[in-house]
Amino acid sequence: MSPPLDSSRPVVVIGAGIIGLTTVVCLLESQYYKQYHPPIHIIADYLPNDPLDAKYASTIAGAHHLSFADDGDGRQRNWDLKTFQVMYEQWRQFGEDSGLMALKQTELFVGQMDHLKIYEEHPNFMTLPASMLPPAIDHAVSFTSLTITPSVYLNRLLKQISSLSNGQVKLHRFHLPSLSFLSHPSIKALIGHEPTAGVIVCVGLGALVLGGVNDSLMYPTRGQVVKVRAPWVRSGYTRQIGSLNGGEGGERTYVIPRANGEIILGGTREEGDWYPYPREATTKDILRRAMEICPSLCPANLVAQPLSGTDDRSSTFSSNEQSPSYENPLDSLVIDSLVGFRPSRKGGIRLERGPDLDENTVVIYNYGHGGAGWQSSWGTAEEAVALFCKATRN
């Protein structure tokens, strides 16, 4: 049974990461919104301009569009391809102001002689001949892909939401303890007293503790990365040792340039690890691995002389001063080491209609993207909104 609708009944999206915000944009572009123009409210613990927090993975992500979709996983492939198409068009239209950068991406494989077929859907795909393979690499491909500067992209989404709604979408920082709390007076004071038409749950790891959801299949996959400044690197590299296994297998090393000259180096995949701070040994290991796959990260002058100087004699160290010493020449380029918790879920993304919250409120779930949130965001958002419109017969 579809709930009765009118233009005064609000729709609530819970979560303001990449999944929640793309879902709101798709909702604003839907036939449902065009017909009813309902109030839309975003309720979230974390917002895009907050200080970095491991539990808000969207701003700590690299990020790049690099699908993990297995060849036989048509649903994930479709989500990822849709997202690439949307983002590639945004880059074509707005350039790097979009927070996106198009670049040559090279995938290096150790211990396997094949690649995911979805890479062949990208522009300029090619398999590298054996004569071009770096030492110890068994297989490699390259293609055009995209990297994302998360803070820029998320803020553009906020502006897009404001533009599409004429400023009518309301963003609330509020810790929602349970879905049933949407009927509490403190929430009604924010979203109005009309019955809620629908709730789209985009809470990532919050699904573990959100009452009415309490999804025990959710778990963190800890990722540690190192942010460096190396604007001369404008190509992306990854090295996969062993089976990818849906995105969480083997050892993966990556170099993700951003349009602003920052580079994200990674990484780790530590399932069930809630430690929110960088581990020094991990930082050193990431720097070592990054140099192995992208030696151009560190120009020759840094290898010979850890701290760049000038020809001016006044800038050199006196006999009483010691020149800085680095274990890795990349140390002098490091901005920060960061940790984020990927919102992983046994069985994969939960994207479905759940039981109605009451006889009048549709509930749609869109969470559990693990490390694939950025690369599947638009595809899953579009499907979540389609499920909502179907539930309300729009």
UniProtKB/Swiss-Prot annotation:
Gene Ontology terms: cellular component: cytoplasm; membrane
Disruption phenotype: Decreases growth on D-aspartate and D-asparagine nitrogen sources.
SUPFAM superfamilies: FAD-linked reductases, C-terminal domain, Nucleotide-binding domain
Superkingdom: Eukaryota
Mode of membrane association: Single-pass membrane protein
TM region(s), chain numbering: 190-210
Keywords, ordered alphabetically: FAD, Flavoprotein, Glycoprotein, Membrane, Oxidoreductase, Transmembrane, Transmembrane helix
Catalytic activity: D-aspartate + O2 + H2O = oxaloacetate + H2O2 + NH4(+)
Cofactor(s) listed: FAD
Sugar-bearing residue positions: 214
GO MF, one annotated term: D-aspartate oxidase activity
Catalytic activity, EC: 1.4.3.1
Annotated compartments: Membrane
Keyword Electron transport set for record: no
GO biological process, one term: D-amino acid catabolic process
Family: Belongs to the DAMOX/DASOX family.
PANTHER family: D-AMINO ACID OXIDASE, D-ASPARTATE OXIDASE
UniProt-recorded name of the protein: D-aspartate oxidase
Lineage summary: Eukaryota, Fungi, Dikarya, Basidiomycota, Agaricomycotina
Encoding gene, per UniProt annotation: DAO1
